[in-house]
């Protein structure tokens, strides 16, 4: 994936929406708390994707060019954990299309680039079942989509 800046995307997250920059809450304190529970969050991401793999063909890769679909369901969680100690993100391509999940080192969220409406609706349902949220960032270029 070379240029993601102009591609439509959504966030699969533990929070229901982006936290405003000047929120009166304790975002960083809460984020540190969830850092200690990252394995649990990764388990939810892996479970969501394993369920999605019942409906869609998934391929995983460490770069945006080379993918494999030869992975066991339990391997997905190990791949997420490996991404936490890697400078390279984990890519999960859907149906050999442009729709790609990206998970980077230590993040509490995944990004889904270029989902069509059918995929997005399915991901929303599966995320909800895992206690996760799917939201789209503000469309203004000055707002950062990352947590």
Which role does the model predict for each range below?
Residues 1-109, 113-147:
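Structured alpha/beta or helical-core interaction and ligand-binding surfaces enriched in interleaved
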């Amino acid at each position: 994936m070379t240029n993601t800046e102009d591609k439509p995307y959504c966030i699969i997250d533990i929070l229901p929406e982006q936290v405003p920059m000047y929120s009166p809450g304790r975002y960083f304190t809460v984020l540190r708390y969830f850092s200690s529970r990252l394995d649990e969050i990764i388990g939810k991401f892996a479970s969501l994707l394993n369920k999605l793999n019942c409906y869609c063909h998934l391929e995983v890769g460490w770069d945006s060019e080379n993918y494999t679909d030869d992975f066991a369901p339990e391997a997905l969680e190990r791949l997420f954990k490996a991404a936490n100690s890697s400078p390279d993100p984990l890519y999960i391509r859907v149906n050999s299309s442009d729709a790609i999940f990206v998970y980077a080192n230590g993040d509490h969220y995944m990004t889904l680039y270029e989902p069509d409406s059918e995929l997005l609706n399915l991901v929303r349902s599966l995320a909800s079942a895992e206690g996760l949220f799917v939201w789209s960032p503000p469309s203004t270029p000055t707002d950062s989509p990352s947590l």
